[in-house]
Swiss-Prot record:
Species whose genome carries this gene: Salmonella dublin
One annotated Gene Ontology cellular component of this protein: cell division site
Region (Disordered): 30-93
Protein name in the entry: Murein hydrolase activator NlpD
One GO BP: cell division
Region (4 X 7 AA approximate repeats): 203-250
Family to which this protein belongs: Belongs to the E.coli NlpD/Haemophilus LppB family.
Amino acid sequence: MSAGSPKFTVSRIAALSLVSLWLAGCTSSSNPPAPVTSVDSGSSSNTNSGMLITPPPKMGATTQQTPQQAPQIQPVQRPVTQPMQTQPVTEQPVQMENGRIVYNRQYGNIPKGSYTGGSTYTVKKGDTLFYIAWITGNDFRDLAQRNSISAPYSLNVGQTLQVGNASGMPITGGNAITQADAAQQGVVTRSAQNSTVAVASQPTITYSEGSGEQSANKMLPNNKPAGTVVTAPVTAPTVSTTEPNASSTSTSAPISAWRWPTDGKVIENFGASEGGNKGIDIAGSKGQAIVATADGRVVYAGNALRGYGNLIIIKHNDDYLSAYAHNDTMLVREQQEVKAGQKIATMGSTGTSSTRLHFEIRYKGKSVNPLRYLPQR
């Protein structure tokens, strides 16, 4: 078959067609061509053979290196310094009683009426109405009434009080009873095993009458409670050392007769010696009636004087006072007029360790033996 024959030509065309179809099948591969980016982009390109081709870096270009992670540095913890705690300095020893601060001032060392600031006083930190009344020579209740201060007599720093001039006269000096004294007198102490405990002194309680009468101020000396030491001012203004008899009373409103304040056995007698009992103690039962020993006016009814519990003081005339301590209940109020034999209280054990009445009679501020005035029985 020659090259120019028609049969040869058809065979050649068929062969070329088969080759073309085969080539077309090879180029239609299912794998897409690998993306090729420009060399200028600095990226690598993949070839159909799967080889990774990395283009050479451009001239003058800086090769970037992956930064290495720096090691973490733990912060240094500095020690925390605690601020220095300073202990507050108190000007006066204090103690807590029923949730209130009680200042343990030694009033025996503070001159009464020593304030020289005029007719007004500005309250300072730590002041109490008792203290202000003491240094200004007033009765604390008169001072409270003058300045419209009600119980419990709270004051504010910077508050101005009208103090005026005091007319009451305090009783100075002091007596103290220890456990040894109590043992000699046969008193059963509440806690005999405890050592002697000092009791905060209280200011003298004064009673300014304001009507020309002598002051009825008579702060009672302490004869108890056993097991404690009480430093309450107790001596009176200078008077004759001779104890008066019942018949030597003042000519103003003389006392015709004295009554026993309650029934019962005298368990402690009057002691004239220093530190002795300044009255008599009468045993009884709780709730037992206590009556006024003579006509008079109640000048004090309260419990501000430690060691006496609920205390009533009656002024009978310019010379005589009577006092009734350790009451369970008080049935009279201050400035109330009472008659001899009138029930004024019930017996109790406030301020002491057993149920009793502590009874005192005072002549011009001096403690006298009540048995020399009371009728025999």
